[in-house]
Design a protein with these regions (language model features):
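Extended, hydrophilic extramembrane loops/domains of integral membrane proteins
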Residues: 108, 112-118, 131-182
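Charged, low-complexity surface segments at secondary-structure and domain boundaries
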Residues: 27, 88-94, 161-163
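Internal alpha-helical transmembrane segments
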Residues: 1-49
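N-terminal membrane-entry
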Residues: 186-187
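Juxtamembrane/interface motifs at transmembrane-helix termini
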Residues: 35, 53, 179-181
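Alpha-helical structural motif
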Residues: 5, 100, 104, 169-173
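Membrane-proximal low-complexity regions enriched in glycine and acidic/polar residues
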Residues: 41-142
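Short, charged N-terminal helix-start/capping segments
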Residues: 17-21, 25, 124-134, 176
């Protein structure tokens, strides 16, 4: 009777430990350079077609990552950035005000960005201001609060917004999985 109990315990512990280790393996690989970048991200990239009538740049969100520190969610990295200069978009920086870091920071606060978030300044003539708060960059502990907003550098209009609710199913799973893997979920 004792030996059967130990065998059963060993099998149960082994099964559940294997499940946890498999979860860590899959969530870790989802943002690794080769497996994540070549296989996972193309499956779960945010569809830029959701941004109606917004001209897109040749640059992707991955270009916003500097020195290996991500500032946008992994599900957006392969998605093209919007391009400034078209005059489209929703009201952002009030008319008559210059579009600069100060007015974009005020807009971020008005849009509900509180606490830690990033504002990326445009790097090219068609570049955009990008306001983001997400778990990949350590801004948030809850991936369901991930949010990225793009602002036209000339007009101050909001060109595009991507939030967790807009992500495809696999991008949602990747965002939650990475936060879980890093121990950030819920902090």
């Amino acid at each position: 009777k004792g030996r059967l109990w130990w065998r059963s315990l060993h099998a149960s512990v082994g099964f559940w430990l294997s499940a946890v280790l498999l979860m860590f393996l899959l969530t870790g690989l989802s943002w690794a350079g080769i497996w994540g970048g070549k296989f996972v991200q193309p499956w779960n990239s945010f569809p830029a077609a959701k941004w109606d009538a917004v001209p897109l740049s040749d640059a992707t969100h991955a270009t916003l990552t500097a020195a290996g520190q991500p500032v946008v969610p992994g599900g957006l990295e392969k998605t093209p950035l919007p391009a400034s200069g078209s005059g489209v978009g929703a009201v952002g920086v009030p008319a008559g005000q210059p579009v600069n870091l100060d007015t974009v920071a005020a807009l971020a606060k008005q849009l509900g960005f509180a606490g830690q978030h990033h504002i990326q300044v445009p790097q090219t003539a068609t570049g955009v201001f990008t306001i983001s708060a997400d778990t990949m960059s350590g801004d948030l502990g809850n991936p369901t609060q991930d949010r990225t907003v793009h602002v036209d550098r000339y007009s101050g209009r909001v060109l595009a917004e991507a939030a967790f609710a807009d992500y495809p199913l696999l991008a949602k799973a990747m965002a939650v999985g990475i936060a879980l893997h890093q121990g950030d979920l819920g902090l």
